């Protein structure tokens, strides 16, 4: 067992990805240095309470608002979120990053009645999930469920077709890319949902998920997201 542990420690060293200190993927000092974001409309970026979609953008979008914790434009935030997408041994780091999100939500007093909301992590297609072996948004959602006392649903929202990476596309292409990529498999009429994702850029993916939920009768659809890429909208 000691030999296996040494091999594991060699292959996957437990060092802070910010400063290199041992025994953690993200030390307290580097966690405090992560750039937090203020609340703003997820589409036009105008300041808004709780990150609610502003009146103007409500006319064109289905998502009611988005809590976003971290600024993805900060190199360290970008590095951490990118690594958690494809390296499952960094699961503990996802928990660390989600702490920044839970802190913001708790301070806001947004969840006065957590039992009214159901968490829906943005899904992968079955093929992509099998290839990767995990979905990082489900891990984030599990942490939020435990920290905030929310319900978690992994079956209602499904991704039915593969899409290109949104980061490679312009705004019009992003909207077209995610069009009709989600389907609803259970009754959602009158229910309130919170979508969970690791990153938002234009908001097209979250808005598409909100659209299909509301087409089936969902009442409110918000989003909880780790980071926002402010360099590309």
Role assignments for model-derived ranges:
Residues 1-196, 201-233:
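Glycine-rich phosphate/pyrophosphate-handling loop used in enzymes and phosphotransfer proteins
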